[in-house]
Amino acid sequence: MEEYKLSHLKELEAESIHIIREVAAEFENPVMLYSIGKDSSVMVRLAEKAFYPGKVPFPLMHIDSKWKFKEMIQFRDEYAKKHGWNLIVESNMEAFHAGVGPFTHGSKVHTDLMKTQALLHALDKYKFDAAFGGARRDEEKSRAKERIFSFRDKFHQWDPKNQRPELWDIYNARVHKGESIRVFPISNWTELDIWQYIRLENIPIVPLYYAKERPVINLDGNIIMADDDRLPEKYRDQIEMKMVRFRTLGCWPLTGAVESGAATIEEIVEEMMTTTKSERTTRVIDFDQEGSMEQKKREGYF
């Protein structure tokens, strides 16, 4: 009898599904953080498969900074409605009404108030004790050293020097009241794995990932798409049309595009075979201070 072997992608899928089911079994009130990006889309599909044909026993939550690409918000609402997800959308409306934004306050203040503080408020509001995130270890060095079950204290802070041992597939889910765990079920996936799985499973994604002629400006070395009329007047005469796509998605003034002709999944996979830079190199927030991502994660960022 021929020995049955899982493919590389199916092994990753099995590991992720095991992690998702473990969280559902161990925690009282988990939530899946949904950024609308490719990694979130894969994570959502894994959750759907983990509990099929039943309903996923936890909600999706999107922290809306009010500066996401219009296509992202449209995709979010259509996907949640079509697939019957319980979608929670939270924003820091106080900061938004005060005019906080990336152009007026800079990436650091904007990210802290509109993303980190909004997230922490939402976690406290709904009393979630576990939150799934779509981070991967190959993205960035601070994420590379974080556990799959990442402990957070009662202030939602992460201490990279005080992480719990994590042996094989044994995860420590013990928390006291007020503490929580951030869970990263696709930690061991690479960007190429993500794209190959999207192709394998035919997972719908935001069209911004595909190359297309788009109105962009060059802002401090980043190709920024002019997504709405909040682009400051001083930049508007710099707008030009370029064939670009996005490798990662976030707030449009803080997310750089890459020049590319990859307009299909197959072309994106082929492009990923030869790329040598992480997709996080196009995210402005990762470079707004020394050790930027680790500091943000210590403060409670995704």
UniProtKB/Swiss-Prot annotation:
One family from Pfam that matches here is PAPS_reduct
Recorded catalytic reaction(s): these are: sulfate + ATP + H(+) = adenosine 5'-phosphosulfate + diphosphate
GO biological process assignments: hydrogen sulfide biosynthetic process; sulfate assimilation
What are the EC numbers? 2.7.7.4
- Family matches, as InterPro entries: PAPS_reduct_dom, Rossmann-like_a/b/a_fold, SO4_adenylTrfase_ssu, Sulfate_adenylyltrnsfr_sub2
| HAMAP family membership | Sulf_adenylyltr_sub2
This protein's assembly is summarised as: Heterodimer composed of CysD, the smaller subunit, and CysN.
- Protein name per its UniProtKB record: Sulfate adenylyltransferase subunit 2
Native organism is Bacteroides thetaiotaomicron (strain ATCC 29148 / DSM 2079 / JCM 5827 / CCUG 10774 / NCTC 10582 / VPI-5482 / E50)
